[in-house]
Amino acid sequence: MVVKPAARGMKPQGQAYKDKSKPADIRQSNINAAKAVSDAIRTSLGPRGMDKMIQAANGEVTITNDGATILKQMNVIHPAAKMLVELSRAQDVEAGDGTTSVVVVAGALLKAVEKLLQMGIHPTAISDAFQKCSAKAVDILTEMSTPIELTDRESLVKSASTSLNSKVVSQHSSQLAPIAVEAVLKVTEAGHESGVDLKNVKIIRSLGGTIDDTELVDGLVFTQRSCGVNGPKRVEKAKIGLIQFCISAPKTDMDHSVIVSDYAAMDRVLKEERAYILNIVKQIKKAGCNVLLVQKSILRDAVSDLAMHFLDKIKVMVVKDIEHEDIEFVCKTLNCRPIASLDHFLPEHLVNADLVEEVSSGSSKFVKVTGIQNMGQTVSIVVRGSNKLVLEEAERSLHDALCVVRCLVKKRAQIAGGGAPEIEMAIQLAAHAQTLEGVDAYCFRAFANALEVIPSTLAENAGLNPIATVTELRNRHAQGEKNAGINVRKGAITDILAENVVQPLLVSTSSITLASETVRSILKIDDIINTMQ
């Protein structure tokens, strides 16, 4: 028997074939997908950034330049690209602003990673070095920052204005910024500044007027109008009752029905219904209630036509169909509990307020409650606008401004904007790289160069020469001008602090930390496995 020699290059039996190029290909695919997402929203960065028009499958159109909103509505399929969408969402939750910057920085860091991998540096070594870079960058930002106090209202307004200046509603920043500051300070509890809950600030959109007509209401605002045709539209010294039961005839459940065979039985049914509703209305009058807030019911009418007739007669103002999710906010504002049963509809469960009135705003009407006794720490903002698209973008912009003020309340320090902190970090990290040896030196230098993407993009979007602008910025910072940044309005490099372009320290530190963490996560992935389900 002749044994033939094994073919050259064949693997011994039992040993699996291993494709050494696969991890590199997967990593490259992930980097390319994430860079594509970053490049897609890069043009919307800064005050001179472009807006995006997003059209949903149902034909609904959104116009915005808010990074989180663009990415949330973008149809992203690649898992690595989805990581950048999640990164933007994480920045939105943590800081509320800087959602575009964080994705642009992550994209620049991934380009730096690509070059480092081509040099043959191991992904784990790059990941560890980037972690050190991130920590060093946060230290540099903290050193650059200026501490502020909550009593310094002017500084808070400046930061809110900077956030609004990059939005569609930038021309109204002088009107919206003080509203955002006032709202956050009103809901901030003494001693619990770190936990400012923006759910205590309710933003109501009202079609009609302009954004300049936006107002802060120290009380409650309902988008519903008062129900009664002949009922009161304005009630002074109001006694408010918030109920969760219906003022209408009870109905059988879905499995049962009532059959009426003759007119006498029909009369009895109507008579019973009238007596039932009249009893409820008498109890409401006896308690001294003159404003009734009724929760929406999915089973039957919250307030029947007959009930409205009786309530109009006793001059009770009725606001019905209050959504279930709004009840918590209403209770917190009125500092009361909802009345779930007629037996508990007593005078001591009512809330006193100076004024409840129905207000007209363009073509829409809403009910405003002011002067509430023992009011909870909540506030309402009525946003006005000429059309739905403007209203939605104004609400998003106002939310970002509220988040910026919340950041300053949580971490009371601010830094210059206009690309100044990024250039300062780049210069200091590059200088630190000179003191290092080996892989860390390469990685620190690459990280420093990547941070220059922010001033470069700001200059590009403002129609300036990015290379010349970044070079001049470097020179100014090298001469010790730490606050020199790009003034896009003047098209020049100026002292950004003197121009009042400031942002919270938390926005920048969060942006650097989250971007580097995401890049490190993408870097460490060497395979994508699809499951059966």
From Swiss-Prot:
Gene3D superfamilies registered for this protein in UniProt: GroEL, GroEL-like equatorial domain, TCP-1-like chaperonin intermediate domain
GO cellular component: cytoplasm
Entry keyword set: ATP-binding, Chaperone, Cytoplasm, Nucleotide-binding
Name of this chain's protein: T-complex protein 1 subunit delta
Localization, UniProt: Cytoplasm
Described function: Molecular chaperone; assists the folding of proteins upon ATP hydrolysis. Known to play a role, in vitro, in the folding of actin and tubulin.
Domain of life per record: Eukaryota
PANTHER family for this protein: CHAPERONIN
PROSITE patterns per the UniProt record, alphabetical: TCP1_1, TCP1_2, TCP1_3
Subunit-level organization: Heterooligomeric complex of about 850 to 900 kDa that forms two stacked rings, 12 to 16 nm in diameter.
Family, per entry: Belongs to the TCP-1 chaperonin family.
Entries under Pfam families matching the protein: Cpn60_TCP1
Species: Ochlerotatus triseriatus (Eastern treehole mosquito)
Span list, region Disordered: 1-24
GO molecular function terms listed in the Swiss-Prot or TrEMBL record: ATP binding; ATP hydrolysis activity; ATP-dependent protein folding chaperone; unfolded protein binding
